[in-house]
């Protein structure tokens, strides 16, 4: 199948960031925004070598003159031409490899439409001439990265969150739930509540500033009401942040109000249950015999679970819902921002996995639908 000396490529395509690197590494080599930008205006300078599109960090840095598009919305690829550009950029510019020489492991959102997996497979074999490929479910990889094969994963990135119960390595599809509430919504909500304080953030460029404020200063309160009272009566929770132009702004209760949306989606007008309740409901959807294994293996994954205090709060909230004698353990690995990628790196370097790859030959014989038979 694949020679031992050729490292497999692992590419985790998130709604917000692409994480890419080589199987066997402990962290991705390349992490860049999943964006494709096209010039808004006609170029006027002769010989400037105008490009018709920019990808990732370059698009981000030139965002003033570009229209930015995210080809992955809510975890699912919606624009295949742009997606191809992102993969091209990943292989040739970021990793600097020839894709026809390396097997590639891609990740997909749970409940990804069948046609999407087929399209991914087709592009890898027909556009990039991959020798072999595989598509793995993101949440399952996060669980592998934590050294488990059974557990319930709450995976929350920039565009989508999923709660996925997994038993002995298999995701239980009837109990999976997707929640379109994730990092981007928290950033938007933080923009809104900062406006109430008198700071105006409106453009896409300013949204990046607010995202940075969120990542640096926000946290999850153990007791929201209590924290609101503390914030009202003293300035102990206030922190200052310097904007790129040197202006300094102060933020107080916004630090935990933004992240509280995960537990109370009604803050942004969503009629959904909070993440603690969702996890509990999904466990209850599973067979009664495996529930206690899920309670003690509740794994957090993805960038939007990086808020300080989130694990303690989950522990407290789920304990309140679960039977009183039930042992509950929330696992929040420090590297959870990249745990999907790390799980992919582990999986693709296992000797037992090598027969799982879909080879070019198998693809030529069966066509794109082979992905449903070999990847589950």
From Swiss-Prot:
Keyword ATP-binding in annotation: yes
Positions where N-acetylaspartate occurs in the chain: 3
Gene Ontology molecular-function annotations: ATP binding; hydrolase activity
EC number(s) given by UniProt: 3.6.4.-
Keywords: Acetylation, ATP-binding, Cytoplasm, Cytoskeleton, Hydrolase, Nucleotide-binding
Domain of life: Eukaryota
InterPro entries noted in UniProt: Actin, Actin/actin-like_CS, Actin_CS, ATPase_NBD
PANTHER family reported for this sequence: ACTIN
Protein task: Actins are highly conserved proteins that are involved in various types of cell motility and are ubiquitously expressed in all eukaryotic cells.
Protein known as: Actin, cytoskeletal 3A
Lineage: Eukaryota, Metazoa, Echinodermata, Eleutherozoa, Echinozoa
């Amino acid at each position: 199948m694949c020679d031992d000396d050729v490292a497999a490529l692992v590419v985790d395509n998130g709604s917000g960031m692409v994480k890419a690197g080589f199987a066997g590494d402990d962290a991705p080599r390349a992490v860049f925004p999943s964006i494709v930008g096209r010039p808004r205006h006609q170029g006027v300078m002769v010989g400037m070598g105008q490009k018709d599109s920019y990808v990732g960090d370059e698009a981000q840095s030139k965002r003033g003159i570009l229209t930015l598009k995210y080809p992955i919305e809510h975890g699912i690829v919606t624009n295949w031409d742009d997606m191809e550009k992102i993969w091209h950029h990943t292989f040739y510019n970021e990793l600097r490899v020839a894709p026809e020489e390396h097997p590639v492991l891609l990740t997909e959102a749970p409940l990804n439409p069948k046609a999407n997996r087929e399209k991914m497979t087709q592009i890898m074999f027909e556009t990039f001439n991959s020798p072999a490929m595989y598509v793995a479910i993101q949440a399952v990889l996060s669980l592998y990265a934590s050294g488990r094969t059974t557990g319930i994963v709450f995976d929350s990135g920039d565009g989508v969150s999923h709660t996925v119960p997994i038993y002995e390595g298999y995701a239980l599809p009837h109990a999976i739930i997707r929640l379109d509430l994730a990092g981007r919504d928290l950033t938007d909500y933080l923009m809104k509540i900062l406006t109430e304080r008198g700071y105006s953030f409106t453009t896409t460029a300013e949204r990046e500033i607010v995202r940075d404020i969120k990542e640096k200063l926000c946290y999850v309160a153990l007791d929201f009401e209590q924290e609101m009272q503390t914030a009202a009566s003293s300035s102990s929770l206030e922190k200052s942040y310097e904007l790129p132009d040197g202006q300094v702004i102060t933020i107080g209760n916004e630090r935990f109000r933004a992240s509280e949306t995960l537990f109370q989606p009604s803050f942004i007008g969503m009629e959904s249950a909070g993440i603690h309740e969702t996890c509990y409901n999904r466990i209850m959807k599973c067979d009664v015999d495996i529930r206690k294994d899920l309670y003690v293996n509740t794994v957090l994954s993805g960038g939007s679970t990086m808020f300080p205090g989130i694990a303690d709060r989950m522990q407290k909230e789920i304990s309140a819902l679960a039977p009183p004698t039930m042992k509950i353990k929330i696992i929040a690995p420090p590297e959870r921002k990249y745990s999907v990628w790390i799980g992919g790196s582990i999986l693709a370097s296992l000797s037992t996995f090598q027969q799982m790859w879909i080879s070019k030959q198998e693809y030529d014989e069966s066509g794109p639908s082979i992905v449903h038979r070999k990847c589950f």
